[in-house]
Amino acid sequence: MAQDVKTQLTALLQQALASVAPAATDTPIHLERPRDPTHGDFATNLAMQLAKALKKNPREIANQLLAELPPSRLVTKAEVAGAGFINFTLDAGFKTDVVKAVLAEGDNFGRSNQGGWQKVQVEFVSANPTGPLHVGHGRGAAYGASLSSLLTFAGWDVTREYYVNDAGRQMDILGLSTWLRYLEQHGVDVPFLPNAYQGDYVRDMAKQMTVAHGDKFVRPAADVLAGTPGLPEAERADDEAKRQRDLHLDALIANAKVLLGPDWTYVHQHALSEQLADGRDDLEEFGVHFDVWFSEQALFDTGLVARCVDLLEKNGHLYVQNGARWFKSTTFGDEKDRVVQRENGLYTYFASDIAYHLNKFERGFDKVINIWGADHHGYIARVNGAITALGLDASKLQVALVQFAVLYRNGQKASMSTRSGEFVTLRELRGEVGNDACRFFYALRKSDQHLDFDLDLAKSQTNENPVYYIQYAHARVCSVINQWGGDLATLADANLALLDNPRELAIASKLAEFRDVIDGAARELAPHLIAFYLKDLAGEFHGWYNAERMLVDDAALRDARVALAAAVRQTIRNGMTILGVSCPDSM
């Protein structure tokens, strides 16, 4: 039981510290596990921390601390190493105590009260509902879901939230794209725009409109194109050509709203609801669930955006220039000031984003975690600035960035897009490699590091595939327990002192690390640390399984080994559950 051992070691060191340096008893004592197991089970740099205050060599202080260390059955060896570290080797009996703790606590092994059940909101994915989720969204979804489960496991009251960007121009473009495909299917000759949404899903939504409403929304091409500025040559890609296409697109949207009248709302909402439902289904199938789906449009409907901008003005953080209202974001470290309300009276996306954060804080969360794509790095300063300008505590907001995942096939970078120029979808990736490989491979790197996703490795059933390797360890334990055929409850009385060979003690030490791994991963918002740990634990188990017989003739030793194996299975299951990966009983 790592926490109890660390508590006991800390108490021993505190007694020694009181004798060696009575004036420095408030010095924090840090205990870490050495990377090299030959250096013992725990190490402390306490002597090096004291060196400046005591004006002594750290090794001299370390030896003095050892001399004053009270005797304890916990420690079989304590020695000075390197520049002044103190390394501790634990008694084997204390190492194997963790096995009983794992079996007794079961699914709760590793849980902590780190968060004190404070309220934390984790907002993630939040992709525009303008098309299918792609592999980039998938990494954010896997990270957010794993982080949410991790924080819950570590004692936080977690709310998982998806911010639905259902207001603004992108939704108008989706509605227009659907209507243009509908007109196309009814023989109306209106050119489809290169800057509209191109995917087959748009055609599918248009067909649904035809099935439900026939030709109700058909309008003459001349009326649809009336007053539009026209399009530049298709091959042009300069800024002016882009501007012309955008003007043409906006003119078509304006015409659609006039020509369809109230029916524009239907077209708009049909496209939104279809894409939102598709994304929700995709995520549910991926094992990613949300407690709240928060509508951006609701911020406008309730007047919160206007109230938020007015509050910024009241606090002296806005100015008017060329008819627009600007937020003084440079005051808070941003590279330039930002428009929150244009000269035509329309609010910017930034304005609604500020209002959304005001809403988060007004809901009383103790911590707010935003999971954003790495391309939003420059957005952090202005959002933090706006929160501060509203008179709120910006330190409650934490932003975790997620880098894009790059797919590899046959050792070569795979195409990330389809023939229509759209990214490979999350659903396609899941269909190829499966949910488990997706969830685990997405968790194999720190979220803000680039991820190379090896499709061939993810599909392989070899020890090189980490998810297979860990699941296989779990399945092997299940096989051992089935062959043993006993009652798991009886393992509480197993004689764990018989687990005395180096491989068994190494596994026990690794099991004892799990609590610390959970604690550190939760503090650092780093579920990848659990993936690393599980790979190591599976490696320790496979090495033991291949070297030793589990079901030996000696009943006492057999039960002890089955107990250790069962503890490995439980710990793997607890870790994989956090990561959203299944643990099959057989493979």
From Swiss-Prot:
Subcellular location: Cytoplasm
Gene Ontology terms, MF aspect: arginine-tRNA ligase activity; ATP binding
Keywords assigned by UniProt, alphabetized: Aminoacyl-tRNA synthetase, ATP-binding, Cytoplasm, Ligase, Nucleotide-binding, Protein biosynthesis
Residues in the signal sequence: none
Catalyzed reactions: tRNA(Arg) + L-arginine + ATP = L-arginyl-tRNA(Arg) + AMP + diphosphate
Position of sequence motif 'HIGH' region: 127-137
Top-level taxon of origin: Bacteria
EC number(s) given by UniProt: 6.1.1.19
UniProt enzyme class: ligase
Predominant localisation class: cytoplasm
Family matches, as InterPro entries: aa-tRNA-synth_I_CS, Arg-tRNA-ligase, Arg-tRNA-synth_N, Arg-tRNA-synth_N_sf, ArgRS_core, DALR_anticod-bd, Rossmann-like_a/b/a_fold, tRNAsynth_Ia_anticodon-bd
A Pfam family it matches: DALR_1
Any one Gene Ontology cellular component term annotated for this protein: cytoplasm
GO annotation (BP), single: arginyl-tRNA aminoacylation
Family: Belongs to the class-I aminoacyl-tRNA synthetase family.
Subunit structure: Monomer.
Record-given protein name: Arginine--tRNA ligase
Organism, as annotated: Dechloromonas aromatica (strain RCB)
Lineage, broadest ranks: Bacteria, Pseudomonadati, Pseudomonadota, Betaproteobacteria, Rhodocyclales
Name of the gene encoding the protein in the UniProt record: argS
